């Protein structure tokens, strides 16, 4: 255990700032500290860890921070990690935030949002939101993930969507693999 005397509480505390050492750390932080790290950390791995840490926390404040990160972070992997953390909450507020996050520009981040929506089994509103993405998106990988998520929903209309997409041509048949 290390103790450092400081004049005030630090805004941000990081171990191994640029992730140079292979490690697993259990460092409990408050929602405010994680929000600050997710917003202001200059290290991608640090922002991803903050998104993952916020995924373990509940509450409106944590969900809002994750939605903001999905929509505005500089790197797609942080956006995708934030979407995954948002999907783990499985509340209607988180689902509605994920609906808004479908507008994210980067296809890999959008793919993470679509994958997070697949956590809402039996939700017809999610099916309605995923249906247009399964039919047509700028990215075949997003279409494939939409098909996977539609299958996870296990709703009566899911099979028809998957059957319609099964024979669609795509890069390396990724859409077919998603069905």
Segment roles from a protein language model:
Residues 43-45, 60, 74-77, 92, ...:
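Alpha-helix N-cap/helix-start positions at coil->helix boundaries
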Residues 70, 106, 167-179:
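Short, intrinsically disordered, charge-balanced linker/junction segments flanking boundaries
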Residues 1-81, 88, 110:
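Non-catalytic accessory/interaction domains
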Residues 137-148, 152-153, 176:
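Long alpha-helical HEAT/HEAT-like repeat alpha-solenoid scaffolds in very large eukaryotic proteins
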Residues 49, 65, 81, 97, ...:
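Alpha-solenoid helical repeat scaffolds
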Residues 7, 26-38, 59-72, 91-103, ...:
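Amphipathic alpha-helical scaffolding segments comprising HEAT/armadillo-like alpha-solenoid repeats
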Residues 99-100, 104-123, 141, 148:
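A generic tandem-repeat structural signature
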